[in-house]
Amino acid sequence: MEAPPYSAAAVDVVRLPGGRTERDHVAVEEPLEIRIGGSPVAVTMRTPGHDEELALGFCLSEGLRPEGARVPDDLAANTVDVDAPGFDPARLQRSFYTTSSCGVCGKGALDAVAVESPRVTAELRIPLSLVSSLPDSLRAAQAAFAVTGGLHATGLFSSAGELLCVREDVGRHNALDKVIGWAFGAGRLPLADSVLCVSGRLSFELVQKAAVAGCPVMVAVGAPSSLAVDLAADRGVTLCGFVRGGTANVYTEAWRISG
């Protein structure tokens, strides 16, 4: 699988020891301005590509109900305008600025961060053997990571373990937003019969995005944070961390995992 050309940039690097100068590739990071009905609402640092999905996923994760997204012909390439009829700009009391490492930087309090969503009640049950296979399946699909070593990924899997969508980005929250935006466009929301697998750790924000999308199970090779566990318990999301070598730690709603 070949990495998309917009995801990697060639740079000179000095190899030590030895001092050889060689060409290498690093992940591309650029700003994207998200607008709703022409009004700027957010700037996020992301890896270019699937920008409409990113904007849609971002809006959905903030509790908005968009109808579509487009790159306006009369604006810079790093701008996406989302169509969300009835959106009130005053509803967002702060200006969003999201970095590639922290999607909620600038949110001053937990009350400002939390997005209301129904408790996930999906009766999905999957075996540990399937759960433990997902990180390897995700890694095998990370074409840009193979070139740069510098991108996070989110994979959306069916209840049978089929990879439905994978997105890579310098920001783990962006990768998840892109997958949620893809699912919106594919008519797959809510994700009641699906599993999300993320590279790295499980943060509060990632769990919140999964809950808003209605996904019952999240899988990661890393650990969850305390707030991630608390939120998953509150929203009914099964949280599986340290998934490797046929083992997993299930922090919440363990009844969905057998074995």
Where is each model-derived feature located?
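Glycine- and Gly-Pro-enriched alpha-helical subdomains that act as flexible
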Residues: 144-200, 207, 212
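Glycine- and other small-residue-rich loops at beta-strand/loop junctions that grip anionic moieties
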Residues: 102, 168, 195-199, 221, ...
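Intrinsically disordered, low-complexity regions enriched in acidic/Ser/Thr/Pro/Gln residues
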Residues: 1-159, 163-166
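A conserved acidic, glycine/proline-rich C-terminal tail/linker
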Residues: 214-226
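Short, solvent-exposed amphipathic alpha-helical segments in soluble enzyme
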Residues: 49-50, 59-60, 171, 180-185, ...
